[in-house]
Amino acid sequence: MTLFSTRHLDMINVMTYDFHGSWDTITGENAPMYADSSETTELARGLNVKYNKTVSLVSLLLFDKATCIQNWLDKGAPASKINLGMGTYGRSFTLQSADNSGLGAPINGAGQAGPYTREAGTLGYNEICEQKGQWTEHWNDDQQVPYAVNGNQWVGYDNVKSIGIKSEYVKAKNLGGAMIWSVETDDFRGICGDKYPLLNAINSVLNGQSVRPAHNRSALFCILYFV
C-alpha cells in the first residue's frame, strides 16, 4: 500500500545526510551509502530479532542512504520522483582520545568550527580541502565513504569517490536525480583538484558533463538538482 499520494508532487528530495553528528556519543559518518555491519548487529540485538534485509523495523532505524531510499520505494513512492540528497560538508567530532580514532570512537562533543561555516561540528568540503595536509584520510569500505583524522579531530564527509558511488546508485535505481546541500561548501577554489569537484562528480555520472555554477554573493545557500 502506498504510504501517501505523490500525485501532486513534482519531486521528493530525500535529505540522506546528517545521519550522525555531535549529538551522538561516538563518531559516525555523516552520509553513509550503506549500513555498517556492527550497527546492524547492535540494532538487531536491541530489538531482539535476527537481522536480515526483510526486517522492516530494523531497516527503518538504519542510518544509511540505501536503506532510506529503499524504504521510500517499498512504501510506493515512484522512483522517478525521488532525488537522492548528497552533502558537500562533513560532521566533525572532538575525540576523547587521539589514540582511539576509528569509526565508533568515543567523543567529547562537536569538532572545531571551520573558518567559513563557523559552526562547531560542521566542516565544508572546501574547509577540509584547505586543511588537507593536516588530515589523515581513511576509506570506510563497509559504508563506502571516507573519514579523516587530525589529532583529536575527526570528520566524516564525502569525497569525489563516494559521491561517484552515490551517483551510480541513482542510475542503478532509476531515481529521478540528485540534489546537494549545498554548493557553497564544495571546493569552489579547486584546492583538492578541479573546481566544484563534488558537483561535477554528480553531473559527470548522471549527465556526462561538468558544470561551473555562477557566483551569486546574495545567495548564501543553494540547492542544485540534477536529472
Feature annotation, model-predicted:
Residues 114-175:
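Hydrophobic, secondary-structure "cap" segments at the distal end of domains
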Residues 55, 131, 205:
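Residues that form generic nucleotide/phosphate-binding pockets
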Residues 91-95, 99, 152, 159-222, ...:
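Acidic/aromatic/glycine-rich contiguous surface patches that form carbohydrate-binding/processing clefts
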Residues 46-53, 71, 149-157, 170, ...:
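Short flexible/disordered coil segments
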Residues 1-128:
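Substrate-binding surface in catalytic domains of secreted glycosidases
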